[in-house]
């Protein structure tokens, strides 16, 4: 089964929501596997037109899954890939 393809759409600096969502996304990586691509809206005119007022945005397999905020647990559910749960 291929890994989910996650695209994190963000911008250069000065985006507190982007920083917070990225931290939650990195935390989710402790529990699920996925491929991550980080895209900056400043460098892609199409992305800028589509998402400038929605960032941060996560696309999962090409579909919008999150905009603005999500917790680690919400991300795990939305990305929903092959789990590799840690046992405490």
Residue ranges and their predicted role:
Residues 10, 39, 67:
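Small/polar loops that bind or transfer phosphate-bearing groups
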Residues 29-33:
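Short helix-capping segments at alpha-helix termini
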Residues 60-88:
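Non-catalytic, surface beta->alpha helical segment in thiol-disulfide oxidoreductase systems
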């Amino acid at each position: 089964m291929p890994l989910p393809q996650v695209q994190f759409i963000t911008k250069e600096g000065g985006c507190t929501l982007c920083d917070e969502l990225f931290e939650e996304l990195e935390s989710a990586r402790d529990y699920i596997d996925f491929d991550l691509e980080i895209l900056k809206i400043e460098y892609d005119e199409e992305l800028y037109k589509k998402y400038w007022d929605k960032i941060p945005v996560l696309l999962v397999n090409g579909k919008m899954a999150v905009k603005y905020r999500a917790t680690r647990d919400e991300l795990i559910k939305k990305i929903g890939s092959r789990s590799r749960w840690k046992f405490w």
